[in-house]
Amino acid sequence: MIQTESRLEVADNTGAREVMCIKVLGGSKRRYASVGDIIKVSVKDAAPRGRVKKGDIYNAVVVRTAKGVRRPDGSLIKFDGNAAVLLNTKLEPIGTRIFGPVTRELRTERFMKIVSLAPEVL
C-alpha cells in the first residue's frame, strides 16, 4: 500500500536507486496504490552515470509491496519491501532489465513488457 511520500526501491536498470511517491494517479481523492497501479514519483537517489538523475519526475508502476496482494483463491503474496519500475510518458518501461520478482497481477496489456523482462513471475 503506497501513499504520497512513500519511498520505493527501483526494480530496473535506469540508474535510479530510490524514488518517492508524489501522487497516486487515478482520481483526485485516491489515497493508496497497490501492485499494478501507476504513481508519479521523484528520483531521490541515483547512480552517477545512470539514465535518470536525482530530482527527475517520472511515472512508475508499483511491482512489489510489503502489504501484499490477495489472490481470488485466498493466498497472499507479500514482499520484503516496496518496489516500482519507471515509465516514460507513453507508460512504457524506461529500463531494459527488471530486477527481482513481479506478481501475476501485472499481466495486463499495458505491462506485458515488464512481465516478459522479469526474471520471476509469482
From Swiss-Prot:
The protein's UniProt keywords, in alphabetical order, are:
Ribonucleoprotein, Ribosomal protein, RNA-binding, rRNA-binding
Query: Per its UniProt record, what SUPFAM superfamilies does this chain match?
Result: Ribosomal protein L14
A cellular component term, taken from the record's GO annotations: cytosolic large ribosomal subunit
Tell me a Gene Ontology molecular-function term this record carries.
structural constituent of ribosome
- Tell me which SMART domains the record gives: Ribosomal_L14 (SM01374)
Task: Choose any GO biological process term that the UniProt entry carries and state it.
Answer: translation
InterPro entries per the UniProt record, alphabetical: Ribosomal_uL14, Ribosomal_uL14_bac-type, Ribosomal_uL14_CS, Ribosomal_uL14_sf
Which family would the database say this protein is a member of? Answer: Belongs to the universal ribosomal protein uL14 family.
Function description: Binds to 23S rRNA. Forms part of two intersubunit bridges in the 70S ribosome.
Q: How does it assemble?
A: Part of the 50S ribosomal subunit. Forms a cluster with proteins L3 and L19. In the 70S ribosome, L14 and L19 interact and together make contacts with the 16S rRNA in bridges B5 and B8.
> PANTHER family from the xrefs?
50S/60S RIBOSOMAL PROTEIN L14/L23, LARGE RIBOSOMAL SUBUNIT PROTEIN UL14M
Protein's name in the database: Large ribosomal subunit protein uL14
Which organism is this protein's natural source?
Ralstonia nicotianae (strain ATCC BAA-1114 / GMI1000)
